[in-house]
Amino acid sequence: MAAQLIVALDLPRKEDALVLARELQGAVPWCKVGMELFTLAGPDIIRELHDLGFHVFLDMKFYDIPHTVAQAVKAAAAAGAELLTLHCQGGERMCSEARIAADSYGSKAPQLFGVTALTSFGPGEMPGISADPSDFALELAGKARSWGLDGVVCSGHEAARIKASCQGLRCLCPGIRPAGADTDDQQRIMTPARAVQAGADFLVVGRPILKAPSPAEAARVIQAEMKAAV
């Protein structure tokens, strides 16, 4: 499957997110609902984005005791989320119970992606962890695969190594910035073309699209770059 673009609807009002989503109809396949938008709008935003024709990635990065995360996965699946994130550092029991919870939805089970090392971390910045973020991401990816997760969230810099060592595991890469774009608060960034060449399956882009004069055109340009990189 060719790499797909996910637009992060990281906006402060539900109405703004829906206006942007309508502008992006037919231009992108996926939208991301993150903590800010979900806290503002609740599960109804997932249904409303489905009604506009989008696949929905719910990026809540679940991290709690196994039972709580399993129940949250069920709630997200019932709301229609098709891809969810949870922290690999929650451990085997948490991730395994999340897998069981997701699978209880049969053909409508959401994909589960484990968060490895946030792309805002640079070397030596992860609290209590001395490993380089890229090495730490690779270690957690191996665990995620053994725990039954569908993929991991990692920077494009880790994608090639993860793909080589964890056969069948998908990579979802935030921190994607077109050449010349502001890095904002991201550190381990990569261009769309390089991320695709590294093996990314999903590319998450927010501000370079949200802040563009024409978000739909910005999304089309990024997808053209992704397609040309194959």
Regions found by a protein language model. Name each.
Residues 26, 52, 79, 147, ...:
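Structural motif
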Residues 2-3, 64, 68-151, 155-160, ...:
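Conserved anion-binding
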Residues 1-23, 27:
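N-terminal glycine-rich anion-binding loop in soluble enzyme alpha/beta folds
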Residues 95-101, 105, 196, 209-230:
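C-terminal helical cap(s) of enzyme catalytic domains, especially alpha/beta-barrels
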Residues 7, 31, 61, 84, ...:
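Conserved, mostly hydrophobic/aromatic
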Residues 23-24, 49, 76, 144, ...:
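Generic structural signal for hydrophobic
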